[in-house]
From Swiss-Prot:
It comes from Escherichia coli O1:K1 / APEC. Keywords: Coiled coil, Periplasm, Signal. It comes from the Bacteria. One of its GO terms (cellular component) is periplasmic space. The keyword Transmembrane helix does not apply. HAMAP family: UPF0194. Residues 1-16 form the signal peptide. Residues 108-209 form a coiled coil. It is found in: Periplasm. This is UPF0194 membrane protein YbhG.
Length: 332
C-alpha cells in the first residue's frame, strides 16, 4: 500500500521535470532567436558609352575606387560637337521660317503682287484681242489654221499667267494658310528635337560613374573604336551593402520587412554588423546550392534582402554571413 503513493510522487516529479525542461528549452529558443545563413550580395555593373566613337582617354584603372559622378573616360568629342553645331543651325532656319509664316506678307510684297496682276491682265487682254482678230482673218481665209492655233495658244498661256498672279495676290492679302503655319511649326519642333538629341549625344560621349564602387576590369584602351553600348569597365558596387539569406515557411513570420538583425562574419565573430530586412520574396523557391544550412537544402524557402546599416570595407562581396534574430537585434 505504501508503494502506490511513492509511485505517484515519482510520476509527479518526473512530469514536473519534463514541464520545466520543456519550458527551459522553449525559453532558450526564444532567447537565442532564429539564425539564418547567407552571403554578402555580389553586385556588379558593366559601364559603357551610350554612343559610339573613338576612345580619347580613360581616367581609372583596375582596382581603383570610384565615386558617383566621377569622370571615368571620354570619347573623341569632335564629331558630336560638329553635329551639335549643325542642329543649332537647323533650329535657326526652322525658327526663321516659322516666324515668317506667322508674320504674313509685307506691304511691299503685296504691292508687287498687285502690280504683277495688272501686268498679267494687260498681257491677257492683248492676247485675247489678238486671238479675236486672228479668228476673223482665218474665217476670210487670210491666215492659215496654224496661225490661228498659235494665237489661241498665246491667249491660253496669258490666261494661266493671269490666274497664277491673281492667286498669289489673294494669298498675300489673306496671309498664310493654317496648314502651312502648322507645317512650319512641326518643322521647328523636329529641329528642336534633333538639337536636344545632339546635346545628349555630346553629353553621353563622357562616361560618368553612376555610384560608388571598385573597378574590377578595364576592357578597352585609348584609341579603341567602340560601338554604342560596348563594355568599357566592370564595376563592383560598394554601397549599399546587401546580404542575401533564405528562410523557411515556418519561420517566415519572424522575417518581416523592417525587422532588425545582427550579422556575424568569421573575421569578427564578437563584433556584429547591424542590418534591417528590406525585402522578402513573395514567392517560394527551392533552396540554392550556396545555402550552407543542411536542414534547409531540400526545403522551399523565401529569399531575404538585408540592408547592412553600418557596413565597412571589411565586408566583402560573396562573404558568408550569419544572420541572428533575437531581442538584442530589436524591431523597427
Amino acid at each position: 500500500m505504501m508503494k502506490k503513493p511513492v509511485v505517484i510522487g515519482l510520476a509527479v516529479v518526473v512530469l514536473a521535470a519534463v514541464v520545466a525542461g520543456g519550458y527551459w528549452w522553449y525559453q532558450s529558443r526564444q532567447d537565442n532567436g532564429l539564425t539564418l545563413y547567407g552571403n554578402v550580395d555580389i553586385r556588379t555593373v558593366n559601364l559603357s558609352f551610350r554612343v559610339g566613337g573613338r576612345v580619347e582617354s580613360l581616367a581609372v584603372d583596375e582596382g581603383d575606387a570610384i565615386k558617383a559622378g566621377q569622370v571615368l573616360g571620354e570619347l573623341d568629342h569632335k564629331p558630336y560637337e560638329i553635329a551639335l553645331m549643325q542642329a543649332k543651325a537647323g533650329v535657326s532656319v526652322a525658327q526663321a521660317q516659322y516666324d515668317l509664316m506667322l508674320a504674313g506678307y509685307r506691304d511691299e510684297e503685296i504691292a508687287q503682287a498687285a502690280a504683277a496682276v495688272k501686268q498679267a491682265q494687260a498681257a491677257y487682254d492683248y492676247a485675247q484681242n489678238f486671238y479675236n482678230r486672228q479668228q476673223g482673218l482665218w474665217k476670210s481665209r487670210t491666215i492659215s489654221a496654224n496661225d490661228l492655233e498659235n494665237a489661241r495658244s498665246s491667249r491660253d498661256q496669258a490666261q494661266a499667267t493671269l490666274k497664277s498672279a491673281q492667286d498669289k495676290l489673294r494669298q498675300y492679302r489673306s496671309g498664310n494658310r493654317e496648314q502651312d503655319i502648322a507645317q512650319a511649326k512641326a518643322s521647328l519642333e523636329q529641329a528642336q528635337a534633333q538639337l536636344a538629341q545632339a546635346e545628349l549625344n555630346l553629353q553621353d560621349s563622357t562616361l560618368i560613374a553612376p555610384s560608388d564602387g571598385t573597378l574590377l576590369t578595364r576592357a578597352v584602351e585609348p584609341g579603341t573604336v567602340l560601338n554604342e553600348g560596348g563594355t568599357v569597365f566592370t564595376v563592383s558596387l560598394t554601397r549599399p551593402v546587401w546580404v542575401r539569406a533564405y528562410v523557411d515557411e515556418r519561420n517566415l513570420d519572424q522575417a518581416q520587412p523592417g525587422r532588425k538583425v545582427l550579422l556575424y562574419t568569421d573575421g569578427r565573430p564578437n563584433k556584429p554588423y547591424h542590418g534591417q530586412i528590406g525585402f522578402v520574396s513573395p514567392t517560394a523557391e527551392f533552396t540554392p546550392k550556396t545555402v550552407e544550412t543542411p536542414d534547409l537544402r531540400t526545403d522551399l524557402v523565401y529569399r531575404l534582402r538585408i540592408v547592412v546599416t553600418d557596413a565597412d570595407d571589411a565586408l566583402r562581396q560573396g562573404m558568408p554571413v550569419t544572420v541572428q534574430f533575437g531581442d538584442e537585434a530589436g524591431h523597427e
